């Protein structure tokens, strides 16, 4: 994932992108690079880079989206994209579709990352306190409707960024 984050450490978005691409320097000639074809920025960056390996697999959001939505821990288009990448890697490693589906359906998520705290027919309480920038907050807000949003922490440059595009889904905001 390449988003405008960690600029406090990298200083500029350009330096951050270059830092992310350094991992590709370790890709061996017979190695495989799996690329999220839906990510325009990542595609632009990768197209400019020379690789030792010619084995590049481009993937898009595919059938994984159908069963991602059944898992309360994997809501949202960003998680569909993450699952698509994971499925592509698993297929490349010859893991059966049955095992892949089982793993996705039984994934319990990570603490503070769109973590379901309470779910009933009427209400969902989600802890997404790891969303510390506008882009990750936007991904969370885009995943739900009728939101009561509790926000806090230290402001980052760029404010709430892309999250402002999904404020129509928010009923009330509580700043702490």
Q: Residue spans of the language-model regions?
A:
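Short internal beta-strands
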Residues: 33-38, 150-152, 169-176
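Residues that form or immediately flank small-molecule/cofactor binding pockets and catalytic motifs
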Residues: 38, 60-64, 109, 119
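Nucleotide phosphate-binding/pyrophosphate-handling subdomain across enzymes
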Residues: 72-171
């Amino acid at each position: 994932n390449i988003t405008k984050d960690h600029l406090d450490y990298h200083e500029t978005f350009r330096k951050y992108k270059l830092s992310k691409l350094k991992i590709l320097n370790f890709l061996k000639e017979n190695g495989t690079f799996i690329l999220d074809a839906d990510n325009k920025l990542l595609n632009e960056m990768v197209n400019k880079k020379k690789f030792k390996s010619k084995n590049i697999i481009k993937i898009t959001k595919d059938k994984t989206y159908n069963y991602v939505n059944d898992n309360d821990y994997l809501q949202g288009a960003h998680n569909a994209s993450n699952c698509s990448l994971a499925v592509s890697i698993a297929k490349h490693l010859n893991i059966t579709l049955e095992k892949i589906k089982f793993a996705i359906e039984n994934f319990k998520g990570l603490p503070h990352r769109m973590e379901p705290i309470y779910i009933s027919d009427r209400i969902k309480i989600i802890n997404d306190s790891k969303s510390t920038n506008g882009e990750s907050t936007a991904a969370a807000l885009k995943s739900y409707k009728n939101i009561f949003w509790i926000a806090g922490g230290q402001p980052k440059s760029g404010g709430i960024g892309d999250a402002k595009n999904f404020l129509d889904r928010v009923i009330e905001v509580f700043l702490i």
